[in-house]
Amino acid sequence: MLLPINLFEYRRQRPVSRTRVRLRKVVMPCIQFVPVWRLRTRLWQWCGANIDSTAWIARTAMLDEEAPELVTIGEGVRISYGVMLITHSDLNKEVGPIHIGPQSWIGAGAVILPGVTIGAYAVVGAAALVNKDVPADVRVAGVPAKIINNTGVPKEWIHITDDNYETMAGSRRSEDVEKPAAAALHEQERSV
């Protein structure tokens, strides 16, 4: 969904100070040279993007410098190398937010255009051009991106934590089931 204003109107109305916008023009091109992904995430957050701290963004992925505050990236999202998140169009300069749902994966070289929402657990193929919303639990690929199929993977398998491990192991609980390292360590501490 594109906003009804163009980029120039948005620049005048945005809630960010002009000094911060100027600093961000210097910082954003340098983020790709930061070797630590958590620091890169913090820098993107400082520039205005709404990124969950568990999201991983590759070095060469780029967020739009014009309006990074319109980008929202959910928990556990993986954004591969060369991905471009563009919040404004060049033809008529309309702006639009980009929302990427939790546990989604964006393949290398994909381009996400303004006004796109990517659902939870979605997978975007490499070099895809996403110009429409992507529903949850699907795979998309191509130019323009089209739905290939459902991911078909139970959500519990994608995001295993100590909290949901016990319920997942449930009925097939045996000595052969390997526990996550944190769960095994916690069990050792309890027995001591």
Predicted regions: what is each one?
Residues 70, 92:
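A short, polar/charged loop-to-alpha-helix boundary motif
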